[in-house]
Curated annotation (Swiss-Prot):
Additional detail: Heme 1 (or BL or b562) is low-potential and absorbs at about 562 nm, and heme 2 (or BH or b566) is high-potential and absorbs at about 566 nm.
Membrane topology: Multi-pass membrane protein
GO cellular component assignments: mitochondrial inner membrane; respiratory chain complex III
GO molecular function, one term: metal ion binding
Any one GO biological process: mitochondrial electron transport, ubiquinol to cytochrome c
Annotated source species: Oceanodroma tethys
Binding site for heme b b566: 98, 197
Predominant localisation class: mitochondrion
Domain of life: Eukaryota
Gene3D superfamilies: Cytochrome Bc1 Complex, Chain C
Residues given in the record as a ubiquinone binding sites: 202
Protein name, entry field: Cytochrome b
Subunit record text: The cytochrome bc1 complex contains 11 subunits: 3 respiratory subunits (MT-CYB, CYC1 and UQCRFS1), 2 core proteins (UQCRC1 and UQCRC2) and 6 low-molecular weight proteins (UQCRH/QCR6, UQCRB/QCR7, UQCRQ/QCR8, UQCR10/QCR9, UQCR11/QCR10 and a cleavage product of UQCRFS1). This cytochrome bc1 complex then forms a dimer.
Length: 380
């Protein structure tokens, strides 16, 4: 019998083992769809971004006009730009749901996969931040100024780092040029990290909603999960295209319709919605260095998840107290997101401080205590 090239060809064999004949648990739910949706988001962003880069000019005098030109004069330029801008929002929706699923079902116990995933999140956040600066609108400029200026809180070397990052003494042409270069480079870094992420995942195999070893009950990825993923892709593209076509500016900031002006500060500087929870944590601490450390901790705390797992059970499927805590954490993050979009005044200040404190207390103290309590309850 002639050898099947799908199983014998060096390149096709790798693809086959990763996407076709991959043994997958038979009971993984729709929450396991988000990995492939993130891959789709990345491909969409790279493709639309490449097309936008062909028409963009990374110069402070021309950046804003070049974006307007893309939307007005380039064939379907408006659609490409809207897909790219809203694609970022959907990217973050997918990654937050993906992390939430990993947290709920104890997927973080695959330590290497989890740690590369957190690195992917950090790289994605960096990419989105530098990308937001490129249209050179008011919020782009002031967002860049405020966020990069935070590095000056680092003792001794902070100010030097900021001036080095800016390429001068303020956010100006050199800053825009290097941000464009970084925004072009980072997605390919994300793609590389994704391959590492998948390599680690396929080393151990997927987790499942029950959190038990599923080696005795596997099914091939294709056709079962390839079809399930195709449905997920359709369900993701539907709201994305709807938003890009009907309300492309829904999640944007109106300030960005005004070209950047260093002499006029917007009344309320805030980042895109997907950074608001971290921004609220940053603002809730009145000290600059303390705020920066809390901001970093809000994301880096994810690295501690495997160390803080004290339960005898992997998932939260049969742990009602941990479930209650998990959904409290979700509500807490929504409150932080809302607070981040509000001005710094009473009662938002105190709500933000309470929500920030609660965020860290739930993650670092209450989850391990609750897990230990549930372990005790198993004995009764």
């Amino acid at each position: 019998m002639a050898p099947n090239p799908r199983k014998s060809h060096p390149l096709l064999k790798m693809i086959n083992n990763s996407l076709i004949d991959l043994p997958a648990p038979s009971n993984i739910s729709a929450w396991w769809n988000f990995g492939s949706l993130l891959a789709l988001c990345l491909m969409t962003q790279i493709l639309t971004g490449l097309l936008l880069a062909m028409h963009y000019t990374a110069d402070t005098t021309l950046a804003f006009s070049s974006v307007a030109h893309t939307c007005r004069d380039v064939q379907y330029g408006w659609l490409i730009r809207n897909m790219h801008a809203n694609g970022a929002s959907f990217f973050f929706i997918c990654i937050y749901l993906h992390i939430g699923r990993g947290f709920y079902y104890g997927s973080y116990l695959h330590k290497e996969t989890w740690n590369t995933g957190v690195l992917l999140l950090l790289t994605l956040m960096a990419t989105a931040f530098v990308g937001y600066v490129l249209p050179w609108g008011q919020m782009s400029f002031w967002g860049a100024t405020v966020i990069t200026n935070m590095f000056s809180a680092i003792p001794y070397i902070g100010q030097t780092i900021v001036e080095w990052a800016w390429g001068g003494f303020s956010v100006d042409n050199p800053t825009l040029t290097r941000f464009f270069a970084l925004h072009f480079l980072l997605p390919f870094m994300i793609a590389g990290l994704t391959l590492i992420h998948l390599t680690f995942l396929h080393e151990s195999g997927s987790n499942n909603p029950l959190g038990i070893v599923s080696n005795c009950d596997k099914i091939p990825f294709h056709p079962y999960y390839s079809l399930k993923d195709a449905l997920g892709l359709a369900l993701l593209l539907l709201p994305l295209t709807t938003m890009a076509l009907f309300s492309p500016n829904l999640l944007g900031d109106p300030e960005n319709f005004t070209p950047a002006n260093p002499l006029v500060t917007p009344p309320h500087i805030k980042p895109e919605w997907y950074f608001l929870f971290a921004y609220a944590i940053l603002r809730s601490i009145p000290n600059k260095l303390g705020g920066v450390l809390a901001l970093a901790a809000s994301v880096l705390v994810l690295f501690l998840s495997p160390l803080l797992h004290k339960s005898k059970q992997r998932t939260m499927a049969f742990r009602p107290l941990s479930q209650l805590l998990f959904w409290t954490l979700v509500a807490n993050l929504l409150i932080l997101t809302w607070i981040g979009s509000q001005p710094v005044e009473h009662p938002f200040i105190i709500i933000g401080q309470l929500a920030s404190t609660t965020y860290f207390i739930i993650l670092l103290i209450l989850f391990p205590i609750t897990s230990a309590l549930e372990n005790k309850m198993l004995n009764f």
